[in-house]
Amino acid sequence: MVAAAGLLGGCLVEIRHVDDPGAAFGQARAEASRLQGQPGPAHRVNVLVFDEGDHKLVRVSLPMWIAKKIQKDGEIDFGGDAGDLAEDVRPHLRLEDIEKAGLGILVEVEEDGGDQVLVWLS
């Protein structure tokens, strides 16, 4: 397992190799479901990606202020470790739309090949 936490701003990037991402996605869905419909602004953008081909599970969590800074300076880049599915979802994630969506699950995708993406606000 590789994990990195940015001290400045509280960013988290966690990369693990797993055979079954079910537990991680179940935990993430439960967290997002508890927040669904709650009042108040989002403070974090959370992304969980599983690449079936590489058996790679990537979790990214970043504060909204960093997401705003990233969008102002350019596009969101999940990095090469996030996989093709995350890069397919990325162009459809506009920060102004994300902020309007409210807390909880924003996007959930599961491809036939086993790749998965879950994006939620907390």
Task: Place the predicted regions along the sequence by residue.
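Flexible glycine-/small-residue-rich
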Residues: V49-D51, M64, E111, L121
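Sec-dependent bacterial lipoprotein signal peptides
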Residues: M1-G9
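Short, exposed beta-strand-loop hairpins at the edges of beta-sheets
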Residues: I98-K100, G104-L121
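A membrane-pore/channel beta-structure motif
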Residues: A42-L48, D54, S122
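Mature extracytoplasmic domains of secretory-pathway proteins
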Residues: D51-H92
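N-terminal post-signal-peptidase region of extra-cytosolic proteins
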Residues: S33, V45-V47, D77-E96, G102-I105
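Post-signal peptide N-terminal segment of mature Sec-exported envelope proteins
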Residues: D19-V47
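Bacterial signal peptide processing site
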Residues: C11-I15
